[in-house]
Amino acid sequence: MKKICLFIFSLFIFIPFVSALEGDVNVTNENPNCTTKDCYKTNKEQEDDLITDLKSAILIEEDSGKILYEKNAHDRYAPASMTKIMSMILIMEEIEKGKLKWSDTLVASENAASMGGSQIFLKANEKMSVKDLFKAVAIGSANDATVVFAEKIGGTEKRFVDKMNEKVKSLGLKDTNFKNATGLDEANHYSSAYDMAFIARELIKHEKIFDFTTIYEDYLRQNTDNKFWLVNTNKLIKTYEGADGLKTGYTKEAGYCLTATAKRNRMRLIGSIMGA
């Protein structure tokens, strides 16, 4: 994960001021005491040094959607918990339509409580507010909380996933097929760095999302004997000025992946990498 954060950090700093200048090729001498041609690297060569261990990557500007950098951006890979970016879109839409309220209480099913991976250890029939469940998803990447929402909105997780795929099509994206709401490894569950960046672009149209994705740590079940500490899986929000989201991911199949957002000087960038 440190390597991923370093790469995104490098993209946010390096790309906007250099690589966004389409057609320009600058040459940098990294060692002023060296005078042979091997001492000099073009921007492209410097970028390639950063991405040796990454399968795919993309950086876009939010407002225009302009691609500032890409590597194998349309290649399909398991997206792990970045899947939850789409899940959160559907949740936010339900809230904005008034079909869900932050103060509503939802009940965990046995199925939701049985989820593995990242979780807040919900028990079957446990009740929790929409706001706290959403914190669990956005901050802690909780699979059990995600399935609670999926079952509430879709009736079943499968029907919720159908809605996720319908949303993908409505956005005109062609590299994504979801099989579950959480991102746990499953056959035929895939996306691309390109699609994840533009799915993220859709999510952050709901500006309320930043009230959650910028939280580094919080607690659930306060004033109980089962207090649960949430720590944001996205360390960039603590270490990189302007970082305000968005979603990390890791599974054995996917490797490490991250879709990150950051804003400085009225410009927000969205970076997505897969397969680190």
Q: Across the structure, where does each feature detected by a protein language model lie?
A:
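Sec-dependent N-terminal signal peptides of Gram-positive bacterial secreted proteins and lipoproteins
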Residues: 2-20
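Active-site-adjacent loops and short helices of periplasmic peptidoglycan-processing enzymes
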Residues: 21-194, 198-207
